[in-house]
């Protein structure tokens, strides 16, 4: 691991904006472990889906020991925009970004002077670390020192691996980073980044003939692979590195709080579970991969317990978007398991299955055990919540779409909604807005996947308003989004569309002077 001090100028300025103490009145400040799954659906976790065919005992234990949110949402229906929004508290459509990076990916979507979640926490005295998939963009240089702009495999072959990455996570608020540029087993560059370097560069083309072949091994592209990079062991390597950080930190700085962002590969296709998990469930390689994810969560919790810090660590577990199309279609057909259940839609779709995600919080003596919340929340809310938790003051040009949900964690929100409105976006930059039970989609169709043909055609629903320019659903009476009320409720359509336009133009949805 590499320890680097960055942004000295901006830290000195922002330090003046930070309150002393912490708003929650908690001393000492808690550690924070944030675990982000990849493409894990609402129905993939057994505490959310009684009919799940895959056991997830460690996630179920998290729910029993903490709070389970039933109306939590990723800000986007695909990876990169969600990750950007999580670490900045800002919707990615505000920087006109919608899709995902691949290969070396970049440049970084987060501006050099933009306040991030880890930077904010570091300014409050936290040691900050990230392990796993970054996927928010990096800048690699060629042998002439020029920024590489060519995509995919062609760009990977141009990288001068003796040069540092100029906008790595350690330049955006993390003290330490070990992980990958994009999807670890998908995207052209199969190598680990340590700090701002790739210590073991890729030396040869990936030999795909040696990888598992099955219905869930799709989405693995030909790329350059490093000698130490085993595609079936990536998540176990990430687990090892996160454990090492936790053990080292508690040994060397027992009184200093930590923020660890553990960003998994699982369960993004291809489903390449580590060998010890092959066949552990009766639901094929993808089910085994889900079980491996659950195992990793359990191992991280065991590490906290072994180190004696579990009771003063806020643990948050969630997913970056809904489940992938192929995994849902195949798992339904092969094993009767539905990762999107009970919602309509999958990853990329504006319907609930594309962005309603599992969200679990554990914090002994603060978050009530075996509790649940139906508050509508977004992953963008993490930044404002951590600001409230640690006493940081958010400037008005930061975390523009982040709401403080700490009162919900602490059981002090009452029945009042934290959010009046919640925004969503898809990989086509289609937008939607939610207010209470009402959800307005400012577009036709899913906003992402095509249901006219292909593997999703069998799951297309009849369109009762085919000429409508948008969609309106009442999730209280129609949680499956089966009946478009666009023509039946014209005033509600007008109201929500106007509010959506207003929030887009305003540049923020969160209140000022939080």
How should each PLM-predicted stretch be described?
Residues 8-14:
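Membrane-interface motif at the C-terminal end of an N-terminal transmembrane signal
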């Amino acid at each position: 691991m590499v320890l680097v001090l960055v942004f000295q100028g901006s830290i000195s300025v922002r330090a003046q904006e930070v309150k002393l103490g912490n708003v929650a009145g908690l001393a000492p400040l808690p550690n924070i472990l944030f675990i982000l799954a990849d493409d894990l659906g609402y129905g993939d976790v057994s505490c959310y889906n009684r009919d799940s065919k895959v056991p997830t005992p460690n996630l179920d234990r998290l729910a029993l020991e903490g709070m389970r949110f039933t109306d939590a949402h990723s800000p986007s229906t695909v990876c990169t925009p969600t990750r950007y929004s999580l670490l900045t508290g800002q919707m990615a459509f505000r920087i006109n970004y919608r899709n995902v990076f691949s290969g070396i990916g970049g440049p970084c979507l987060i501006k050099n002077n933009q306040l991030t979640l880890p930077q904010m926490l570091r300014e409050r005295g936290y040691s900050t670390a990230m392990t796993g998939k970054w996927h928010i963009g990096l800048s690699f240089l060629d042998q002439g020192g020029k920024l590489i702009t060519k995509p995919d495999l062609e760009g990977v072959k141009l990288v001068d691996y003796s040069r540092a990455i100029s906008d790595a996570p350690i330049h955006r608020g993390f003290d330490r980073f070990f992980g990958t540029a994009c999807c670890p087993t998908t995207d052209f560059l199969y190598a680990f980044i340590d700090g701002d370097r790739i210590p073991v560069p890729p030396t040869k083309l990936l030999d795909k003939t040696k990888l598992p072949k099955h219905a869930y091994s799709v989405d693995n592209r030909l790329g350059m692979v490093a000698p130490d990079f085993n595609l079936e062991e990536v998540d176990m390597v990430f687990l090892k590195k996160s454990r090492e950080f936790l053990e080292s930190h508690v040994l060397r700085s027992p009184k200093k709080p930590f923020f660890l962002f553990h960003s998994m590969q699982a369960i993004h296709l291809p489903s390449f579970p580590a060998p010890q998990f092959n066949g552990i469930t009766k639901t094929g390689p993808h089910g085994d991969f889900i079980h491996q994810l659950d195992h990793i969560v359990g191992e991280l919790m065991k590490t906290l317990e072994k180190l004696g810090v579990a009771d003063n660590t806020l643990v948050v577990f969630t997913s970056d978007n809904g489940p992938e199309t192929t995994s849902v279609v195949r798992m339904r057909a092969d094993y009767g398991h539905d990762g999107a259940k009970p919602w309509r839609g999958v990853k990329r779709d504006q319907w609930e299955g594309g962005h309603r995600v599992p969200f679990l919080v554990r914090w002994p003596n603060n978050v009530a055990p075996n509790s649940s919340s139906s508050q509508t929340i977004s992953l963008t809310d993490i930044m404002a919540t951590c600001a409230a938790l640690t006493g940081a003051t958010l400037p008005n040009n930061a975390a523009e779409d982040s709401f403080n949900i700490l009162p919900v964690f602490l059981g002090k929100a009452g029945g009042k909604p934290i959010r009046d409105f919640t925004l969503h976006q898809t990989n086509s930059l289609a937008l939607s807005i939610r207010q209470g039970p009402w959800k307005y989609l400012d577009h036709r169709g899913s906003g992402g996947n095509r249901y006219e043909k292909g593997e999703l055609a069998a799951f297309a629903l009849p369109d009762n308003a085919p000429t409508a320019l948008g969609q309106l659903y009442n999730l209280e009476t129609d949680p499956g989004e089966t009946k478009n009320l666009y023509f039946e409720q014209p005033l509600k359509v007008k109201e929500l569309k106007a509010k959506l336009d207003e929030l887009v133009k305003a540049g923020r949805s969160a209140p000022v002077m939080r």
